[in-house]
Amino acid sequence: MGERVVILGVGLHPFGRHPEKSVGELARVAALGALKDAGVEFKDIQAGFCGHVVQGVGAGLRTFGEVGLTGIPITNVELACASSSRAAMLAADAISGGIYDLAMVIGVEKMERVLLSGVGGAEEIGRAHV
């Protein structure tokens, strides 16, 4: 079994309607809070994992770029409601396996009125009452 993995810090942007803010701006508030909580700096982060649903191709790169973390490997995770938890699991696996010592996981979504219409299979899931 690999090394023990812990969550050093957490951050959260207050929930609510924020039409004036980009996804990256929302993520930055949470990321800065997590760094402060953990007592680490941006330069300490070796990899980023971004969980989202409908932010599109390259969402992790854009989000981490707006947060201020560039030049590190970024993994995008698009797995519907399990996106962010899977991103955390992937980060933990990478740390446990000795690939990284410190990674940041960002779970981000900006809900729109037409959100589920853009998710492939949403109608089928609804019909199946899942």
Spans of features found by a protein language model:
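Conserved "HGTGT" condensation-loop signature of ketosynthase/thiolase-family condensing enzymes
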Residues: M1-I74, D93-G97, V108-R127
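Active-site-proximal alpha-helical scaffold in enzymes
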Residues: L79-E109
